[in-house]
Each structure stands twice: as C-alpha cells, then as structure tokens.
C-alpha cells in the first residue's frame, strides 16, 4: 500500500491472492494504521492527508475565520487522516486570537501522533510576524513548518523593541516570568498607565482560572497584541490552554458542592454548559474544590471587562460563549454550539482605546 495507495479491499485481496473477507477483517482490526476514504478505498493513515486553509475576506484572520474553516472541514482531532496541513493563505495577517487557536490545535494534533505541517509558503510576512510573537517557541518540536521552521528568536531583544506585542508566553505554575506583570509593563510602555492595572488584574484572574482547570501536559500560553482600527487602538489578549476546560472540570463538582446550580443547568438541556459558563462569569463562587474555596476569578474578570467595555469570548471543547460589555455593564451574551472539537479553554479579551 505504500506503492499503490487508495485500494479497495477486493483489489488488495486480488493482489495478495487471498479472500476479501480476510483482508477486510485485517484492515478493521488495524484501524490505527489504516483508514478508509470517501470512496471506500483503503490507505495507510500516514498517507491520508487533510488540508485546512484559514481563509479570510479581509486583511486579518480572526478566531471567527478559524472556526469557519474548522466547520467547513471538521475538526482534524476527530478525522481519520494521519497527515494534517494547516495553511496560512497569502496577503493575510494573523490576529493573536486566531494564532492561539491554530497553535493549540497543532500542538493537540502532535500530542496524538498526527503528522502536522504548518504551511506559510504563500505568506512569509505572517511567518515573520509570528516568529516575533514567539509562536514557534510554543509550537511542538515534531511539527514541520514550511518552507522552514525559523531559528529561535532573541527573547530579550524582542521584549525591548516590541512594545505593541507581548509574545506568546508560557503559562507555568512555577515560571521564570510573571505573565500578568509582563502584560502590564508592556501596556504601560505603549499606552501609559490608563487601564493598565485593570488589564493586569483581569488577565491575572483569567490565567489563574485556566491554570486551575488545565490538567494537561501540553503547555498553555498567553499573549497581548494591539493594532490600529478605524481611528482607535484595539487591544487583543489571549489565554489558551489545551487541558480539560473550565466546564468539564466544574461539572463533576456541581452535584457534590452546588446541587442548586446543577439543578439549574442539567446536562440534558441544550446550551446548558454554555449557560453555566455565563452564570459563572456573572455570579462567581463556583469551584471544583467546593464552596468558599476559589471560584471568584471569572466574576472578577467580568467586572473588569465591564470597566473596560470589553468583549470576552470563551471557547470550550465544542462550544463557545461571548459576553459584550457597554457603558460598564453587560450589554449582551450569546453562545455557539456544536463547534468542531478543540480541547481546553481558549479566552479572547478585546477592547478599544480611542486615540
């Protein structure tokens, strides 16, 4: 099958001069090595390829474009293909909100031993920008980058010369650097002290909350980016983790510690998990460790998001919620269900500063 891929069972049986049912049984007994395509032909999984291109009609690729591309192709975490190509098209820039999800998806695929390639051949500018963001420092070493993986960047040099970009920093329980402090320093350098303490606090809470619900060996990360949009400066902060996710770790604690909340949001009802996340953001107090032991982080984050008139989106394994704040209060909330699989918690925090 290495020389002649995509053969049907009867064709393989004919070549080997054996019964077709023997071939079929062998193939189904070894699905970790073989896969059947849409034409019922069999091939080695490592030769079965899926390409996902993150296309966008405008300049910036956002998390919405990422989600549309996954909806179009399906999550590669659920597909039968052993070889996944994630492609960045020409003449497009990648916002951190999209870069974080591409990075998380690639690392999750590498964790399950898929052959993964990131294709920047049509967009060297995006590759260069993401290099400055330390994207490739966070990328699993087994992932191939086209046309080639950049050499390691000079961390101190980038930190000193890039005030509008905080590179994707690892979230570690015992790290060399305090990530929220690094955000605050960069924010003050670029924009003065306005809102710097609020940003520091909200991101500290979000990062702490993600750490509490992680339970994974894949390192999480956070980053801060600013860009000009229609006469104002837009700030995008991301916190991304590939663990179990907030909802998955809260659920087991509800029946034991918060039965009234469990009754309010039964898993059998549609959108129940999304509503649970919104409830935690608005009311706080929920913790996998029980009452009075943490659980205030999401509510505190919501309060500071309101003070910044921010938009917050929280992506879980198969759904997301979005909370939009105006006039320092929650203006609206929404959710999207049935999203393609992406493990963990992926938070995007956006707000504007008028010049």
Predicted regions and their residues:
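Flexible, glycine-/charge-rich segments associated with ATP-binding catalytic modules
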Residues: 47-78, 140-142, 248, 252-259, ...
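Conserved ATP-binding N-box helix of the HATPase_c
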Residues: 103-105, 194-230, 302-305
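Charged low-complexity interaction tracts in eukaryotic proteins
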Residues: 24-49
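N-terminal assembly/transducer modules of large multi-domain enzymes
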Residues: 25-26, 50-140, 337-355
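Conserved short strand/loop->alpha-helix "switch" segment adjacent to the catalytic nucleotide/phosphoryl-transfer site
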Residues: 93, 181-204
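Short capping segments at the starts of secondary-structure elements
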Residues: 2-8
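ATP-lid-like helix-loop hinge signature
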Residues: 209-253, 258-259, 333-336
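A short acidic, leucine-rich amphipathic alpha-helix
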Residues: 11-13
